[in-house]
Amino acid sequence: MSWRLLTGYQLCRLRLFRKPQPALKIRPSSVCVTYGTDCQSNKENKRTVETLRACSVDIGKICRLKGWVLLEEETYAEEIANILKELGANQTVIASILERCPEAIVCSPAAVNTKRKLWQMVCKTKTELIQLIEQFPESFFAVKDQENQKLNVQFFQELGLKNVVITRFLTTASSIFHNPVENNKQMIGVLLESYLNLGGSEANAKVWLLKLLSQNPFIVLSSPTAVGEVLKFLQGQGFTDSEVLQLLSKLKGFLFQLQPGSIQNSISFTKTTFECTDHDLRQLVVKCPALLYYPAPVLEERIQALLKEGISVAQIRASPMVLELTPQIIQYRIRKLNSLGYGIKDGHLASLNGTKKEFEANFSKMQAKQGRPLFNPVASLKVEE
């Protein structure tokens, strides 16, 4: 495709397609996962339906969401409800959990009790535990590889991660606990070695690692080979060890999830667009790692959106962080600034930057400043007699 942005630069745009996965039959002994099917009342397990109704569960919701569980011959609805009750859940909470995660009733009580003990390794109280289960029932009722999950929890605790962080991982990044613990240990070792090889201080290594993990736990799913390839590529592009370490920290480890080919396309596009030298390019990338992270077509779309607002390439180059924002966010923020009479075309783009919270706070300050009187009308005037 031909770039529409001031140049004739050409890049190849790749598209990935996924074939839909066929539905699978899940037995009670399997990991609890999501499959949808219509209820067939003549084939429903009557005991299961009656037990769920006794728990005030809306059967219609289960039919619409995961009706297949009602067709299973062997279910544990009563046992699972009792486990939740033992943890302090009332009937309303139990019904809510089972309605949102019906597959819980095909998990064996033994497996669920094992999972309860696992989560209690990082939860201080039963109250905290049941609140987590209510928020993330699907994570709790994924009862596969529990011994490996336990080993990973112990490993992260030994590493120095706080229980509150591990709890967040269990609920929002559960896949890292299914990864073999030896693989996670190996990747942690690779990260520490890379940090030290890039000039990081040994005294600060553990603090750096724990911060990186808390920001991006999925980094442990990267491969040592991918890490080596990305580091070698960036060093081949002229980035110093210090600059690579800055990129690794600023991108929160997502750097290792990129492919050298994609990075090369983004670098080439940036260099051509901003007409900069190799040295200037590296400075831009270190200042705004988004130039490295986002694919060239995404960068082009965002630059084009800025140009349509009357912003120049020179302005973008002076404040490249603006490219971290989507065109929709840019348009919204420009309209808000225009409402105050602020001409973004003539000013610095820094006023557009920041998170939503940061932008709104800065906007409020600008708004208050604009409405402030030039003098205090109640202050006494100093008049020379």
Curated annotation (Swiss-Prot):
**Which GO-annotated molecular functions does the record name?**
DNA binding; double-stranded DNA binding; nucleic acid binding
Q: Does the keyword Glycoprotein apply?
A: no
The answer to keyword Lipoprotein applying to this record is no
GO terms under cellular component: mitochondrial matrix; mitochondrial nucleoid; mitochondrion
Q: What does this protein do?
A: Binds mitochondrial DNA and plays a role in the regulation of transcription of mitochondrial mRNA and rRNA species.
Supply the PANTHER family for this chain: TRANSCRIPTION TERMINATION FACTOR 2, MITOCHONDRIAL (PTHR15437:SF1), TRANSCRIPTION TERMINATION FACTOR, MITOCHONDRIAL (PTHR15437)
Q: What is this protein called?
A: Transcription termination factor 2, mitochondrial
**Species per Swiss-Prot/TrEMBL record:** Rattus norvegicus (Rat)
Q: Which gene encodes it?
A: Mterf2
